[in-house]
Amino acid sequence: MKKIVLALTFVLVGSFMLAGCSKDEILNHYNNIVQSASSIELTGKLSLQGEKEKGIDDYTGTYTADYANFSGTEYLFGGTSIKRESGKELSIDCTLEITEGTAKVFWISGSDEAVTLIEATGTYSDIITLPDGGNYIGIECESFTGSIELNIE
């Protein structure tokens, strides 16, 4: 019962806050809420194996790491913006060095299957266009020893 009352209260408060707002203002408010919630998907700074410097938003920045027998997935950059202020294009430059195990840098968009950007020792450079909705760039590792340098603008 308390959950229903709480949910109804949020709906009413939200309605009052948005009353008198234009369609664009409502969309901007919604976009801000969705973007704030999306940062939960990113791997926390303390849980990362390397060093991350945030760029102008959660979609951009640099990440460098040296891995030693690491297995797991790190979601490094991204979010769920409906209308990203900096546009839909991202420039990605990545250098991956695999000494042992496997590692792949990927891009996942919405409910689509992840797209592998690089999974062998070498470099990757491209510009991708983000569709609306959730977009994340990460690295998936299995007993991975090696390094990564990732720059996204």
Feature locations, PLM:
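Edge beta-strands of jelly-roll/beta-sandwich modules across compartments, strongly enriched
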Residues: 141-153
